Amino acid sequence: LKLDLHGWNTDFACWCSYKYLNSGPGSVAGAFVHERHHREKLPRFAGWWGHDKNERFLMEPEFKPMASAEAWQLSNAPVFSMAVHRAALDLFDRAGMDALRAKSEELTGYLAFVLKTISAAHGDPFTIITPDDPAQRGCQLSLLVRENGRALFDTLTRNGVVVDWREPDPSTSLRAGVIRMAPVPLYNSFEDVFRFGGILDNALRS
């Protein structure tokens, strides 16, 4: 999804980078703080890395935050994970978010078509519970599998498909689990989705 946090008048936002930004487990998080809060004396978990960098090493007793989102930093970031993150962001910059979003809508739309076609052919064993409107979703689709969902997940995994599994909600009587899948526009292709459809179809037949 394309974000416009400032334009949306968002106060604060935070996110991880390990999955969709390709930075790996344990990588740095990101944070957004609207500029109207930059000079406010808000309660915060303050760290020395958020102190005014021109006076940081004076070791004064009072915290003097930087006038930006940097003021919410606690300590210096880990160098090795930052290097991986930088390389990942360079790839996104080269590809361009407009192009990635356009491909994402087409690729995820194609996956939804494939899933609905296969589900109808097998008596609707699963339902896509992700919003149908492309503007209301990213590239991930979640399937609510009515029966034998874990077995279906295991079969897909054995066939080289990287998806993940969420156990049924224990607070309800519904015993349907969820399989989540995401055709990532940076490196997945329409052929990948087509081949996945064949694997899923064969898995349901077996």
Regions found by a protein language model. Give the residues of each.
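Conserved small-domain helix->loop->beta segment predominantly found in fold-type I
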Residues: 68-75, 92-145, 164-176
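Conserved PLP phosphate-binding loop immediately N-terminal to the Schiff-base lysine helix
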Residues: 1-22
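Active-site core of PLP-dependent enzymes with the aminotransferase class I/II
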Residues: 1-4, 32, 187-192
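Active-site C-terminal subdomain of aminotransferase-like
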Residues: 22-26, 32-103, 109
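Alpha-helical structural signal in soluble globular domains
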Residues: 4, 8, 110, 114-118, ...
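PLP-dependent enzyme catalytic core of the Aspartate aminotransferase-like
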Residues: 147, 153-206
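Short loop segments at secondary-structure junctions
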Residues: 18, 33-38, 145-148
